[in-house]
Swiss-Prot record:
Chief location bin: cytoplasm
Assigned GO CC terms: cytoplasm
Organism, scientific name: Zygosaccharomyces rouxii (strain ATCC 2623 / CBS 732 / NBRC 1130 / NCYC 568 / NRRL Y-229)
Region annotated Disordered, chain positions: 507-526
Name of the protein described by the UniProt record: Oxidant-induced cell-cycle arrest protein 5
Superkingdom of this protein's organism: Eukaryota
Subcellular location: Cytoplasm
Similarity remark: Belongs to the OCA5 family.
Gene3D superfamilies in alphabetical order: Ypt/Rab-GAP domain of gyp1p, domain 3
Length: 561
């Protein structure tokens, strides 16, 4: 007797097969692009569809080699702050002078780093952890040896190293790359507490298999070693524009009230003089935007939250935002979702011309736009089947030459956007016949850290009703240990080589696929059907929130002349 498949299950099964096929195409495309060194196309895939977990250890180093924030770095500082009253930088209270920063006893610093790293290895037998700890500690120390005058050690540096080692191999052997993969203890009542796991390492291809014919096409040589990759990804995560200079220039420009306006709209007094929604700001500005959007989009959920001490890791109640905002998801997010967040950061690329690069990197003095191509050169069939919009597109924004004399600052762009998208404005001319833009790469239109802000809002919106029902302890647990958001993606990549698709039916109910953070409570958080969605759903939602919120902001802050 043939068993009838319920319509809902059949629909889900079909969706899964389609998703699995798309994941296979993505893997094959990435391998081919890797073999050709096409970092432009790989960056586009990273910021839109994401890099397959099997391939991050090869793709991320290539993306970091050509990342604008690595070629021309500028990071936020935790050693000095700007004194606006006296117009100079001063040491953060309790910080050693710049000449003494590197004189702190190395042994004390090493112990501090090891103390934080061991929180990850708490369930691993001690005999197996020493080598991994030393490798990770050395990566952090090498970063500090170069950058400690600007950024002294914080626990976030250790957790970024751990997060990186979950995708970038510490060692390699005949089985391929070996990565961190701690087996967290499940918190059901049947597990034995504090029982150590034999190892925290596992072959990447065991968890995320790759067919042999694709393995053979991967580049054999490594671009960077682990320490070099770590330094570069920290430069991206801690990147910060020169906000002090930018604010001064924008304020000076806004004082030219007598200058004629290009469009039909002017900035309301005191509004948007320095609001780098596009070009990005420092950590304080990112946090300010987060809470502003949070309170606007999710007013009910926002009520119990506070901005006080929001980016300090010491507070259990508010420390989650330190991991979200300052560390780009380290520690608080599951590795699969953090991988996607870091894909977005590493795949960020502005239009490859000097003006646009300098619009985002306003401190830049290097010329490197020649390193990039503006059109797809390989696998056009695959790219033509994907959306040709940046997830954070906005009407007409991609047609404005950012950074040129007319659009030097964010508020210049805002004026133009509102003017172009207002009622009565002339429609743009039709495309010129024969002008084929099918192979044109859609580049990033806003700062990557601002993108993450809206992704975080989308995550909260996605879980809004659940969070509204939670008690304070449950909410804190959720925010400090965000349940997996991309489970459908993860299942497809783990079963890339499976022939028997019937395993799918077990995939969405297996609790083994729900990793838990060590020491988490017995709360059953994130085990509903929504966890089976793709991360791309969150990314799409974030783009929608961005467009709606920006338009409301423009209408509120500008007045018709």
């Amino acid at each position: 007797m043939v068993e009838n498949i319920p319509p809902v299950l059949s629909s889900h099964h079909y969706k899964h097969l389609k998703h699995l096929d798309r994941c296979k195409q993505l893997v094959e495309t990435c391998v081919e692009l890797l073999s050709k060194g096409d970092h432009d196309a790989l960056a586009y895939l990273a910021r839109t569809l994401g890099i397959p977990p099997q391939l991050r250890h090869k793709v991320w180093p290539l993306l970091l080699k050509y990342h604008p924030m690595c070629i021309s770095p500028n990071i936020l500082s935790n050693t000095v702050v700007w004194d606006s009253e006296h117009n100079f930088y001063k040491l953060v209270s309790g910080t050693s002078s710049s000449n003494d920063i590197n004189k702190e006893p190395r042994e004390g610093l090493e112990n501090l780093i090891l103390h934080d790293l061991k929180k990850y290895f708490r369930n691993v037998s001690k005999s197996e952890e020493d080598h991994e700890l030393q490798v990770l500690k050395e990566a952090v120390l090498k970063f500090l040896s170069k950058w400690s005058r600007i950024f002294q050690y914080e626990s976030g540096l250790a957790w970024i190293a751990v997060g990186l080692a979950e995708w970038i191999p510490i060692i390699e052997n005949s089985e391929g790359p070996i990565v961190l993969n701690e087996r967290k203890n499940h918190t059901s009542g049947t597990t034995t507490p504090n029982q150590p796991n034999p190892t925290c390492l596992s072959p990447l291809f065991k968890e995320y298999p790759l067919p042999s014919y694709l393995k053979s096409k991967l580049p054999k040589d490594s671009i960077f070693d682990f320490n070099e990759i770590y330094e570069r990804i920290v430069l991206v995560i801690l990147h910060c524009p020169d906000t002090i200079t930018a604010q001064k220039l924008v304020e000076a420009e806004s004082l030219k009230n007598s200058a004629p306006r290009r469009g039909s709209y002017a900035i309301k007094e005191g509004k948007l003089n320095y609001s780098p929604f596009l070009s990005g700001g420092d950590l304080g500005y990112q946090t300010q935007v987060f809470f502003k959007v949070f309170s606007t989009v999710l007013p009910e959920l926002y009520q119990p939250f506070t901005e006080e001490n929001a980016v300090q890791p010491s507070s259990k109640r508010t420390g989650w935002l330190y991991w979200w905002m300052k560390c780009s998801g380290a520690r608080a997010f599951q590795k699969q979702d953090r991988g996607r967040l870091w894909d977005i950061l590493l795949g960020w690329r502005p239009e490859p011309n000097r003006h646009t690069i300098d619009f985002f990197l306003n401190y830049n003095s290097k010329k490197f736009d020649h390193l990039y191509h503006s059109r797809f050169r390989n696998n056009l069939d695959f790219f033509n089947s994907t959306s040709k919009n940046d997830p954070f597109w906005f009407p007409d924004l991609d047609t404005i030459p950012l950074g040129t004399s007319k659009f030097k600052y964010d508020f210049n762009v805002f004026e133009e956007l509102l003017d172009r998208n207002s009622y009565g404005h002339d429609a743009p001319p039709d495309p010129v016949p024969g002008n084929n833009d099918d192979d044109k790469i859609p580049f990033s239109l806003i700062d990557s850290h601002i993108q993450l802000v809206f992704i975080y809002i989308a995550i909260l919106q996605h879980n809004e009703f659940k969070l509204l029902e939670f008690e304070e302890t449950e909410t804190s647990e959720f925010l400090n240990n965000v349940p997996m958001l991309s489970r459908a993606d993860d299942i497809c990549f783990k079963r890339l080589c499976d022939d028997d698709q019937s395993t799918y039916q077990n995939g969405f109910t297996s609790q083994e696929d729900l990793p838990k953070r060590p020491g988490s409570s017995k709360l059953r958080i994130g085990s509903d059907a929504k966890t089976s969605r793709s991360f791309n759903d969150i990314l799409t939602m974030a783009g929608d929130i961005w467009r709606k919120w920006l338009w409301q902001e423009l209408e509120e802050c500008f007045v018709s002349e």
